[in-house]
Regions:
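Short loop immediately C-terminal to the Walker-B catalytic DE motif
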Residues: 56-57
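Conserved ABC ATPase "signature" region
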Residues: 4-21
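Conserved ABC ATPase signature
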Residues: 25-29
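Catalytic Walker B motif of ABC-type/P-loop ATPase nucleotide-binding domains
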Residues: 50-53
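ABC-family nucleotide-binding domains
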Residues: 60
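H-loop/switch region of ABC-family ATPase nucleotide-binding domains
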Residues: 85-86
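Hydrophobic anchor residue at the start of the ABC signature
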Residues: 39
């Protein structure tokens, strides 16, 4: 791993409140910590498109807002992010377009 990659990883771990666990085995992390780590890994991947299924389920309000802010930032920087969620607060916090899936056809809002 390059120094630049290590710096990016450190930054993401710090941003998501996980730096103190950098040497911990994932099984030692709580569910919310694992969830934040998975999102940090997805962001770190550098992929142009991220597909996130219920990315904030089980997270407290503070961490949900942290994730929402980072997703907005990633989108502003040109990343396409598809979020599948039932969380209205997350939708209102970071989504530009919404498609509701139900029994009737929906339109993009």
């Amino acid at each position: 791993m390059t120094e630049e990659s290590k710096d990016r990883a450190r930054h993401l771990l710090k941003e998501f409140g996980l730096y103190e666990y950098r040497d911990a085995h994932p099984s030692a992390l709580s569910g919310g910590q694992k969830q934040r780590l998975a999102i940090a890994c997805a962001i770190f991947s550098g992929r142009g498109i991220l597909i996130l299924d219920e990315p904030t389920s089980g997270l407290d309000g503070r961490n949900m807002r942290l994730i929402a802010e980072r997703l907005k930032s990633e989108a502003r920087n040109g990343r396409t992010i598809l979020v599948i969620t039932h969380d209205r607060e997350l939708i209102e916090s970071c989504c530009d377009n919404v498609v509701e899936v139900g029994t009737k056809p929906s339109e993009v809002q």
